[in-house]
């Protein structure tokens, strides 16, 4: 399992990308508004898992991870906020409850990323 983790991780990203593309092209995000929630959760989880995968592979990243700017939680929050700004600038149709939708996206993404963080941090940073 450990040997094939990179392939599993790549496959998970590929699956999420295919699913996201299908859901976007089919306008399913706008028909089933709840689809946004598992996508934000899974992408944040995969993002943090990918960070730890490369952290475990590269010794130099372990020192870098100790610097506040490269703290994985800080990076996660920065990427989640950047994604929301990206969606806004792309012209994603704004619903009447855009603020609540954005807040939910941020919280769900943070939960997904933190779940991965707490699972992998003791196995990677503490080594």
Where in the sequence are the language-model features?
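Bulky hydrophobic segments
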Residues: 1-127
């Amino acid at each position: 399992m450990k040997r094939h983790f990179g392939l599993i991780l790549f496959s998970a990203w590929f699956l999420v990308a295919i699913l996201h593309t299908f859901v976007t092209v089919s306008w399913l995000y706008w028909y089933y508004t709840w689809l946004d929630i598992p996508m934000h959760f899974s992408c944040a989880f995969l993002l943090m898992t990918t960070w730890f995968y490369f952290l475990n592979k590269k010794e130099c990243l372990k020192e870098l991870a100790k610097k506040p700017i490269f703290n994985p939680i800080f990076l996660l929050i920065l990427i989640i906020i950047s994604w929301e700004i990206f969606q806004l600038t792309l012209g994603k149709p704004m619903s009447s409850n855009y603020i609540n939708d954005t807040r939910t996206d941020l919280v769900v993404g943070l939960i997904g990323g933190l779940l991965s963080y707490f699972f992998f941090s003791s196995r990677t940073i503490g080594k």
